[in-house]
C-alpha cells in the first residue's frame, strides 16, 4: 500500500514485478470492497434524501430552494467528509495496515511513553458508538428496502415488519456458517446495485439538467439563512447520506487503501451523486411532493426489480456491519477491554472471518427489538445519526494525536484540519442530539451500555491485578528459596499461565502447598497483546532464565490475532528450549470472584465485573491448549 510522507509506521511494501497480476488483484479487491465497505453508505439513498426533504418541509410540499439546498448539502457532505476527510487523510492513519477506531486508538496510545488513560477512554467511547450504529444499520436498511413494496401496493403495509424480521432472522442465523461462499456474490450484486441507482438517477437528470446547479454551495448558504431553525434540524437528516463512511477505515485491513479509494472515486461516489441528483429532479418534476422518491422514480417494470435489488443490497450492508462488530469485539477482547469471548473461525484461509455466538445473539435481539419498537424506517432515522457522528468525532480527535505525535506534522496544519473536521462533526452531532427523545436514545443507550461494560472490565481487571500482586510472593524470591531447598522433583515440564510474570502464580503456590512436588522444568508463561494488528514470529517469544528450575516466557500477539499457545511455544525450540507438548502440563488458575466493599469500586460495579468475568470463554479453548494437558486449580478472590 503506497503511503504519502506521513511518517506512518507502516512498513514499505515491495513493488510487484508483475504489474498485470497486481492490477487484476486490485480489481478483485475493488469488487470485494463494493460489497463490504460500501454496502452501508450505498443503501443510504433509499431513505436519506426523503428524510431530509421531510425535515425541511415539515412533511408538506418541498419548495425549490429546499430541494436544491438539501441536494447541495448532501453533495458537499459526501465530498468533504468522505472524499477529503476519510479518503485523503484518515485512510493514511493505518496501524500496520489495519484500520478502525480501536486500531487508531492503539496507534495513538502507543505514541505516549506511558499508555494514556485518556486515549483509552476515547477509544472505549468510539468503540461503543460503533456498536450503537451496528444495531441500527441492519434494522433501518432492511426495513426501508421492504417498505418499497408499499409503493408497489399499499396493501402490503401489514407485512412490512414481519417480513423484515424474517429476513433479519435468516441473516443472523447463517452467520455461524461464515460468509466465505456468499461473500463471493456480495461484490457483483453491489456493483449491479450502484449501476442501477446511478442509471435511475441519470434518467431524471437528463429530463431536468438544471438540477445540477445544486453543486453550487451558494444554495447551502441560502438554505441556512432562509430558515436557520429548520436547516439545523434538516442537517441531522442530511447526515444519513454519509452514514457508513467510517466503514472505509474500519475495513482498511481487509482490502487496503488503494482498492477502497479507487472503488469510491470510480464507482460509488459518481453513482451516489447521480442518484441523489436524480431524486432531486424527480421531486422538482412532481412540484415538490416528497413521497418516496427513490422507489417512485423507478416507474413501470423497473419498480419491483429495484425493490428486490434494494433488499439484497441492504442485507449485504447488514452483513458488513455484523462482520465489523465481530472484528471490533475481537480487537476489544485482545486489548483487554472486554472479557474473553468465544471466537469460532469460519474459514481455513481467512483468519478475519470469524463468528462470535454471544455477540451475534445480542445483536439479533437488539436489532429485532428496534424493528418492532419503531416499526418504520422514518422513525428509526431519528435514532441513526447520533452514534455515527460521535464515532466520527472520536476519529477526528485520535487523528489529531497521530498527525502531531507520529506523523510529526506542523502544528498549524494539524490544528487547521482538526478544526475543520471537528466543526463539521460537531455540527452534525448537535443537529442529531436534539432527536434524543424522538429515537436517538436507542443508539445512546446501546453505546452507554457498552461504555459501562468496557469501563468496568478495564477498571476491575486493574484492581484485581493490583490486589493479586500484593498477596503473591515475588517469583525471583520463591525460585531462589526452592533452589536452596528443593522439594521432590518430578519429570516433565509445567507451564503456569499468569498475567503477572513477576509474581509466583497462584496455581504454582497451590501445587507446592498441596502436592509437595515441583517439575524439573517450570515455565512462568504470560500472554500480552501488542498495540499492532499482527506480530511477526521473530518477535513472538521472549525467554528469560530465572534459575535452573524456572524460566519466564512472554508470548506477544497482535490485537487481530487469535492466541495459539502451543504453536507459539514451538518457536522456543529455535531459542534452545526443547518444547514437547506431550510431556508438558499446563496449570491454570480458575478464580471465583466475590464482591467486597473494600475493592475501590462501588458494589454494583463489583457485581457487574463478576458477571462479565463469568461470561468469559474457557482459557483452555481460547488459548487453544490441548484439554488433556491442562490442570485447573480453583481459587476464591474477593474484589
UniProtKB/Swiss-Prot annotation:
Alphabetic keyword roster: Cell inner membrane, Cell membrane, Ion transport, Membrane, Potassium, Potassium transport, Symport, Transmembrane, Transmembrane helix, Transport
Cellular component aspect of the GO annotation: plasma membrane
UniProt feature, compositional bias: Polar residues: 1-16
Catalyzed reactions per annotation: K(+)(in) + H(+)(in) = K(+)(out) + H(+)(out)
Coiled-coil boundaries: none
GO molecular function: potassium ion transmembrane transporter activity; symporter activity
Entry similarity comment: Belongs to the HAK/KUP transporter (TC 2.A.72) family.
Function of the molecule: Transport of potassium into the cell. Likely operates as a K(+):H(+) symporter.
Designated name of the protein: Probable potassium transport system protein Kup 1
Amino acid at each position: 500500500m503506497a503511503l504519502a510522507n506521513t511518517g506512518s509506521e507502516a512498513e514499505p511494501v515491495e513493488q510487484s514485478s508483475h504489474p498485470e497480476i497486481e492490477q487484476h488483484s486490485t480489481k478483485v479487491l475493488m469488487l470485494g470492497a463494493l460489497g463490504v465497505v460500501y454496502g452501508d453508505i450505498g443503501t443510504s439513498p433509499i431513505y436519506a434524501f426523503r428524510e431530509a426533504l421531510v425535515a425541511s418541509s415539515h412533511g408538506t410540499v418541498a419548495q425549490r430552494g429546499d430541494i436544491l439546498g438539501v441536494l447541495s448539502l448532501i453533495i458537499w457532505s459526501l465530498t468533504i467528509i468522505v472524499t477529503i476527510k476519510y479518503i485523503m487523510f484518515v485512510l493514511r492513519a493505518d496501524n500496520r495496515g489495519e484500520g478502525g477506531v480501536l486500531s487508531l486508538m492503539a496507534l495513538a496510545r502507543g505514541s505516549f511513553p506511558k499508555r494514556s488513560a485518556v486515549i483509552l477512554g476515547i477509544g472505549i467511547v468510539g468503540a461503543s458508538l460503533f456498536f450503537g450504529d451496528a444495531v441500527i444499520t441492519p434494522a433501518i436498511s432492511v426495513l426501508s428496502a421492504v417498505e418499497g413494496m408499499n409503493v408497489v401496493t399499499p396493501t402490503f403495509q401489514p407485512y412490512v415488519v414481519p417480513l423484515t424480521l424474517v429476513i433479519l432472522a435468516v441473516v443472523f442465523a447463517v452467520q455461524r456458517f461464515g460468509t466465505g461462499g456468499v461473500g463471493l456474490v456480495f461484490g457483483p450484486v453491489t456493483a449491479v446495485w450502484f449501476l442501477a441507482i446511478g442509471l435511475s438517477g441519470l434518467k431524471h437528470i437528463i429530463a431536468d439538467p438544471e438540477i445540477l446547479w445544486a453543486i453550487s454551495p451558494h444554495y447551502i448558504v441560502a438554505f441556512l439563512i432562509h430558515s436557520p431553525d429548520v436547516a439545523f434540524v434538516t442537517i441531522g437528516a442530511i447526515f444519513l447520506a454519509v452514514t457508513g463512511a467510517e466503514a472505509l477505515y474500519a475495513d482498511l485491513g481487509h482490502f487496503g487503501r488503494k482498492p477502497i479509494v479507487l472503488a469510491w472515486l470510480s464507482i460509488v461516489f459518481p453513482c451516489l451523486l447521480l442518484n441523489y441528483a436524480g431524486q432531486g429532479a424527480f421531486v422538482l418534476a412532481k412540484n415538490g411532493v416528497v413521497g418516496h422518491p427513490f422507489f417512485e422514480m423507478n416507474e413501470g417494470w423497473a419498480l419491483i426489480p429495484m425493490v428486490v435489488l434494494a433488499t439484497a443490497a441492504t442485507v449485504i450492508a447488514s452483513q458488513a456491519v455484523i462482520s465489523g462488530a465481530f472484528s471490533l469485539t475481537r480487537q476489544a477482547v485482545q486489548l483487554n477491554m472486554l472479557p474473553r469471548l468465544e471466537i469460532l473461525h469460519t474459514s481455513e484461509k481467512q483468519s478475519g472471518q470469524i463468528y462470535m455466538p454471544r455477540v451475534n445473539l445480542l445483536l439479533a435481539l437488539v436489532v429485532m427489538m428496534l424493528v418492532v419498537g419503531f416499526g418504520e424506517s422514518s422513525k428509526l432515522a431519528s435514532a441513526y445519526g447520533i452514534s455515527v457522528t460521535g464515532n466520527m468525532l472520536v476519529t477526528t480527535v485520535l487523528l489529531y494525536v497521530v498527525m502531531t505525535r507520529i506523523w510529526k506534522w506542523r502544528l498549524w496544519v494539524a490544528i487547521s484540519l482538526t478544526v475543520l473536521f471537528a466543526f463539521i462533526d460537531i455540527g452534525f452531532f448537535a443537529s442529531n442530539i436534539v432527536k434524543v427523545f424522538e429515537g436517538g436514545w436507542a443508539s445512546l443507550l446501546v453505546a452507554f451500555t457498552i461504555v459501562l461494560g468496557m469501563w468496568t472490565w478495564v477498571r476491575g481487571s486493574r484492581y484485581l491485578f493490583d490486589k493479586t500482586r500484593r498477596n503473591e510472593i515475588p517469583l525471583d524470591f520463591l525460585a531462589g528459596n526452592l533452589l536452596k531447598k528443593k522439594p521432590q522433583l518430578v519429570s516433565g515440564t509445567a507451564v503456569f499461565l499468569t498475567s503477572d510474570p513477576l509474581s509466583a502464580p497462584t496455581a504454582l503456590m497451590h501445587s507446592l502447598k498441596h502436592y509437595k512436588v515441583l517439575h524439573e522444568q517450570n515455565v512462568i508463561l504470560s500472554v500480552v497483546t501488542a498495540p499492532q494488528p499482527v506480530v511477526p514470529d521473530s518477535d513472538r517469544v521472549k525467554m528469560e532464565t530465572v534459575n535452573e528450575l524456572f524460566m519466564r516466557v512472554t508470548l506477544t500477539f497482535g490485537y487481530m490475532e487469535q492466541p495459539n499457545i502451543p504453536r507459539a511455544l514451538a518457536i522456543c525450540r529455535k531459542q534452545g528450549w526443547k518444547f514437547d507438548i506431550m510431556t508438558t502440563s499446563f496449570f491454570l488458575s480458575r478464580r471465583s470472584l466475590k464482591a467486597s466493599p473494600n475493592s475501590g469500586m462501588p458494589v454494583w460495579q463489583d457485581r457487574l465485573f463478576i458477571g462479565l468475568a463469568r461470561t468469559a470463554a474457557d482459557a483452555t479453548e481460547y488459548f487453544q491448549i490441548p484439554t488433556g494437558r491442562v490442570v485447573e486449580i480453583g481459587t476464591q478472590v474477593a474484589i
